[in-house]
Amino acid sequence: MDKEMFIRRLGAASHRKKAETVIKNGKIMDVFNQEWLETDIAITDGAIVGLGEYEGGNIIDAEGQMIVPGFIDGHVHIESSMVTPPEFAKAVIPHGVTTVVTDPHEIANVSGVKGLEFMLEQAEMTRLNIYFMLPSCVPAAPFEKSGAILNAADLHPFYSREEVLGLAEVMDYVAVEAGEPDMVQKLIDADKAGKRIDGHLAGLSAGFVNVYRAAGVLTDHEVTTPEEALERVRRGMYVMLREGSAAKNTRHVLPAVNEKNVRRFFFCTDDKHLDELVDEGSINYQVKLAIQEGLDPFLAYQMGSLNAAECFGLKTKGAVAPGYDADLLFISDFENVSITKTMINGVIWSGTEQSQSTGGKAASGLLQSVHLSDLHENDLQIPIVQENEIRVIDIIPNQLETKLSLAKPKSGAFFQPDLESDLLKIAVVERHRGVKEIGLGVVRGFGLKEGAIATTISHDSHNLIAVGTNDQDILKAIERLGEIGGGLTIAKGGKELQSVALPIAGLLSDKPLETVNESLKSLHAAITETGFSGAFNPFLTLSFLALPVIPDIKMTTEGLFDVKAFRHIPVQP
């Protein structure tokens, strides 16, 4: 804040000058005392300068509505929306999200520093408050075949940027425990810069929680049970309750929250597809869900705003009080979280704002990122010994974790998908350098009866991942993604059914939100032609089957990976 702005705000606060904007006739939520106030809100230069009776150049009549702090998404990968930051903003602001803390490790895994710089530049083109955590694990594990590597020296210069809040989810727990030099340097650099460090403690024991806390890690969003949540809070951590497209943990973890410990909990979406953001919402959905599950509404709203702000040191976010930014929501129904207006930095979001994103032009260096070797159906064969059982990845709907099981395959020298037993073939294909590296395995739980689906969104290294009922359609889906520069596709009968092109790093569209949303709806409608009828997002579920830091069993370009043993294993024991 410059001196002139400081003086203007003091003048308005002290009544020596009129405030720029005054909101009257509203019920103000006091997140500190958990009570309602009936008074004016004075705003100048985008900040709240006073509560009380004020005169202003611009008067907003709240008409008896409730005024609450804007919502904060504590951990989100914007790339999972498949649109650029300005288009993402258009999806979440109407749902009351005024601030997000994002980890751009998806695009960084494909394009490294260039991808990180692209996201920082795009974030400046929107009114949404976008803060960044620097990707800590690119790639997610040392054996991963990502498109880039980010070491401590690559990240260090970014800490001088005001919008960078710290080091993003530290996933490589083996490197942390072993004190691997570059990981140690990343942790030390974040600490020296006075920044926060996010964790990623999926399925880890209390002993590992101790290790992470000793390393300075402050948060975890991978909690799936109340017991895990309390374990982390006891050790001084913040816990994020997550509700994304693939992982829906809010209901399961919420019983851990009470009046004594609530300040250590807040909400995040992590990964949520665009169509679900538009239709269902973001943090607003979690606040409403928490209230429906019996949490005190004041505490739910506090978790959606102030708690995240305090965790990340955002001193001017998360409350309706003097000294805080005028990021406000007008609410007509408190428990149903019915938002009528969203204000960011003192200006009402009209819904007609045009994106300033330069889309494909700005991303010119991130295009044409899908490089595939020549593949044939025999490259997809999995040799088996008929008498032996095979290892199977069992998916858990709406969770990121999987289970390792055994199953009896059909007779033959090679694995054949068994539709009656829902045993399908899964493939991870290297797509960054065009080398022929293909990991093959068997998965159960998708319920496809025909065809195949594939995507270049494949956490976190973002190679190409496909699942299908036959090799012909799997190969067709793979080839189609190469032709369109990445994205999502469905193949059946050797032909393309529907695709969504994501030419920016194989992760993002260069099209407006509305166009991408319609394409996604068409994609989800088309997948029913494969016989899919599951109550989960098949593409997002598929994309997380390649993340080898979430238990129990995942896939890489080298094949099946046992996360707990931290090693690759063959399809047949």
From Swiss-Prot:
Record has Manganese as a keyword: yes
What are the protein's UniProt keywords? Hydrolase, Manganese
Q: Please name the top-level EC class of this enzyme.
A: hydrolase
> What highest taxon heads this organism's lineage?
Bacteria
Tell me which Gene Ontology terms the entry assigns under biological process. Answer: adenine catabolic process
Required co-factors = Mn(2+)
Gene name for this UniProt entry: ade
**Which Pfam families does this UniProt record tie to the protein?**
Adenine_deam_C, Amidohydro_1
- E.C. numbers: 3.5.4.2
This one is known as Adenine deaminase
Family annotation (CDD domains)? AdeC
Q: Family per UniProt? A: Belongs to the metallo-dependent hydrolases superfamily. Adenine deaminase family.
Describe the reaction catalysed, as an equation.
Answer: adenine + H2O + H(+) = hypoxanthine + NH4(+)
Listed SUPFAM superfamilies: Composite domain of metallo-dependent hydrolases (SSF51338), Metallo-dependent hydrolases (SSF51556)
GO terms (molecular function) for this protein are:
adenine deaminase activity
